[in-house]
From Swiss-Prot:
Present with 721 molecules/cell in log phase SD medium. NCBIfam families: gal_kin. Pfam families: GalKase_gal_bdg, GHMP_kinases_C, GHMP_kinases_N. The gene is GAL3. Belongs to the GHMP kinase family. GalK subfamily. PANTHER family: GALACTOKINASE-RELATED, MEVALONATE KINASE/GALACTOKINASE. Signal peptide: none annotated. It comes from Saccharomyces cerevisiae (strain ATCC 204508 / S288c). Induction: The GAL3 gene is a member of the family of galactose inducible, glucose-repressible genes (which include GAL1, GAL2, GAL7, GAL10, GAL80, and MELI). SUPFAM superfamilies: GHMP Kinase, C-terminal domain, Ribosomal protein S5 domain 2-like. This is Protein GAL3.
Length: 520
């Protein structure tokens, strides 16, 4: 595996599938805007999660892939005494922006209270600037970055990792512009610096999106681990005899206002899985570590409990190292403990019942668990949430085992077996984690009835996108699934959609190459 970000050059050879036509269009659009040709294009793709929903903040590994939609940043380096950045977006909804770069080499200011598209570029600029100061302090500590004209173009749908792809492309563009065309940046370094980029606009993500955008490979899924450190390993899908593997990504067009719904949705789920971990720790008399650098895990999480349980009761002092067989064995044990501990309270725990389960007072429980994030609830569904996290983590390992060691006698065997895991994931997201919605369930049902083998939500849920495992090639079902979704979902629920909006709502993709540079 190439450890550095790939660089392609003119004349065009071996460009990523999704980039073959787009690079010509973005070069032309750049020329129409700035009346010169760009020096290079920084590209970063969108992503979808194949299996592994709402388990990353419990530090369990996930299985995403990069897709054939991307953010392109075409760049012309400027030799200016007072350097500035001019940003133009292909989408006219986003106005052109221009900002001066600090002459003393200080960081560009970012105001997270302002919802502004250029802030995401500034996030990438900021982490790239920090990286440059570390690798070449004598050059970048007290002098400004170079100025540039930049044209941004994207076809990544909402929920497909647009902001993360933008920050990755922006960081790569900044490093290339300042270090020259012969400088190589490792995928590891680009992932590491961009994993925290969006924190500067108040988005506390964990690095999965950036790792997927950077490490993506054609025809591969990525096994993204969060312990002992962020790591992405590509795994190739099996070679089939008569079909190709494609994914249909269909947007429900349901937008969940995260600020308004977080107290009953995302924030509440984080609280519930944290309380579940501590209730299990109390019941089995083990201590959970505190992660002070992560408010989500400050009081420990469900993976911490698994490691602590095995340290005490199975004499396994070392935490789980990611081994598939060991992980499957331990997760099955965790599911057994969840049944033993919570199954009598499937209706949920009141604050009084939860505090009793943690051997603390109601006041202590409120202080420790209900003040970090605003939440609203009648009961905490510890059984359902813990069962989802452990069973979903188990499905990730089963999927990985299937990709690395299973033998399939027919193409249909693969689609059936892998699709079953995706369908089980959707059922768990819907019934146990309750992060699906009516529209998501409708799309999944229509797709499954018309040629998809596995259909599920992808991303946070409560709307957003769905992903469907569909055979492609001469005998494939892609067009059949796409046509059914248009006729039975979009035309019924959204009859006023334009052809362009419909085109954007359904994407057909194979696993795509990650972040790269194209030199003109």
């Amino acid at each position: 595996m190439n450890t550095n970000v790939p660089i392609f050059s003119s004349p065009v050879r071996d460009l990523p599938r999704s980039f073959e036509q787009k690079h010509l269009a973005v070069v032309d659009a750049f020329f129409q805007t700035y009346h010169v040709k760009p020096d290079f294009i920084a590209r970063s793709p969108g992503r979808v999660n194949l299996i592994g929903e709402h388990i990353d903040y419990c530090d369990f590994s996930v299985l995403p892939l990069a897709i054939d939609v991307d953010m392109l940043c075409a760049v012309k380096i400027l030799d200016e005494k007072n350097p500035s950045i001019t940003l133009t977006n292909a989408d006219p909804k986003f106005a052109q922006r221009k900002f001066d770069l600090p002459l003393d080499g200080s960081y560009m200011a970012i105001d997270p209270s302002v919802s502004e598209w250029s802030n995401y570029f500034k996030c990438g600029l900021h982490v790239a600037h920090s990286y440059l100061k570390k690798i070449a302090p004598e050059r970048f500590n007290n002098t400004p970055l170079v100025g540039a004209q930049i044209f941004c173009q994207s076809d990544i749908p909402t929920g497909g990792g647009l902001s993360s792809a933008f920050t990755c492309a922006a960081a790569l563009a900044t490093i290339r512009a300042n270090m020259g065309k012969n400088f190589d940046i490792s995928k590891k370094d680009l992932t590491r610096i961009t994993a925290v980029a969006e924190h500067y606009v108040g988005v506390n993500n964990g690095g999965m999106d950036q790792a997927t955008s950077v490490y993506g490979e054609e025809d591969h899924a990525l096994y993204v681990e969060f312990r002992p450190k962020l790591k992405a390993t590509p795994f190739k899908f099996p070679q089939l005899k008569n079909h190709e593997i494609s994914f249909v990504i269909a947007n429900t067009l349901v937008k969940s206002n995260k600020f308004e719904t977080a107290p009953t949705n995302y924030n509440l789920r984080v609280i519930e899985v944290t309380v579940a971990a501590n209730a299990l720790a109390t019941r089995y008399s083990v201590a959970l570590p505190s992660h002070k650098d992560n408010s989500n895990s400050e009081r420990g999480n469900l993976r911490d409990f698994m490691d602590a349980y095995y340290a005490r009761y199975e004499n396994q002092a070392q935490p789980w190292n990611g081994d598939i067989g060991t992980g499957i064995e331990r997760l099955l044990k965790m599911l057994q403990l969840v049944e033993e501990s919570f199954s009598r309270k499937k209706s949920g725990f009141t604050v009084h019942e939860a505090s009793t389960a943690l051997n603390c007072s109601r006041e202590e429980f409120t202080r420790d668990y209900l003040t970090t994030f605003p939440v609203r609830f009648q009961v905490l569904k510890l059984y359902q949430r813990a069962k989802h996290v452990y069973s979903e983590s188990l499905r990730v390992l089963k999927a990985l085992k299937m990709m690395t060691s299973a033998t399939f006698h027919t193409d249909e065997d693969f689609f059936t077996d892998f699709g079953r895991l995706m369908n089980e994931s959707q059922a768990s997201c819907d019934k146990l984690y309750e992060c699906s919605c009516i529209e998501t369930n409708q799309i999944c049902s229509i797709a499954l009835a018309n040629g998809s083998f596995g259909s599920r939500l992808t991303g946070a849920g409560w709307g957003g996108c769905t992903i469907h495992l569909v055979p492609s090639g001469a005998n494939g079902n892609v067009e059949q699934v796409r046509k059914a979704l248009i006729e039975k979902f979009y035309n019924v629920r959204y009859p006023d959609l334009t052809d362009e909006e419909l085109k954007d709502a359904i994407i057909v993709s194979k696993p795509a190459l990650g972040t790269c540079l194209y030199e003109q």
